UniProtKB/Swiss-Prot annotation:
Organism of this sequence: Caenorhabditis briggsae
Membrane topology type: Peripheral membrane protein
Subcellular location: Mitochondrion inner membrane
Name the record gives this protein: Probable NADH dehydrogenase [ubiquinone] 1 beta subcomplex subunit 2, mitochondrial
Family: Belongs to the complex I NDUFB2 subunit family.
Length: 160
């Protein structure tokens, strides 16, 4: 029966022979490499302005091809790009973003003005008929008229 140490050394030697380990056996010693040539072949995925496999005439067309609106300040979008950053936001992206933000702000403003209780919570709002005359400061009908402190005989605007 083989010992554990021998099995570990054998596995280490196999990994070194395949080029997956560097000379120093460390925790991060597995080499990460780029895939080139036939290793890099993968599924046909939408990349760039074209969609689908190149031999598919239904998906791989120039119909509806959008390369950005150059007159509105967009950079032209290439047919294909690989391992490059995106060209930035296009005019359509900016318009859709502006429209969505305008709708959200309109909804928020409308509801803050007309239905603020939905956003801030409800509180009890009593009817005016629930208050008594005494709470509102209204004298009884049988009470004598209060003395009026007015300026009856003076011209308007001269008594202040």
């Amino acid at each position: 029966m083989l010992g554990n140490k021998f099995v570990a050394q054998l596995a280490l030697q196999q990994l070194k022979n395949r080029g997956l380990l560097t000379s120093a056996p460390r925790l991060t010693s597995v080499r990460h490499r780029f895939a080139w040539g036939s290793d890099a072949v993968g599924p046909n995925v939408p990349v760039g302005g074209k969609m689908g496999a190149s031999e598919n005439p239904e998906l791989h067309t120039y119909d509806g091809d959008y390369r950005g609106t150059i007159s509105k300040g967009d950079k032209p979008i290439p047919d294909y790009f690989y391992r490059t950053p995106t060209t930035g936001r296009t005019y359509i992206d900016r318009c859709v973003t502006y429209f969505i933000s305008a709708v959200i702000w309109a909804w928020f403003s409308y509801h803050m003005y007309y239905h603020s209780g939905h956003l801030l919570g409800h509180w009890y709002m009593p009817y005016l008929t629930e208050f008594s005359d005494e709470e509102l400061g209204i004298p009884k009908d049988s009470a004598e008229d209060p003395e009026y402190w007015g300026n009856h005989k003076k011209e308007y605007g001269t008594y202040r």
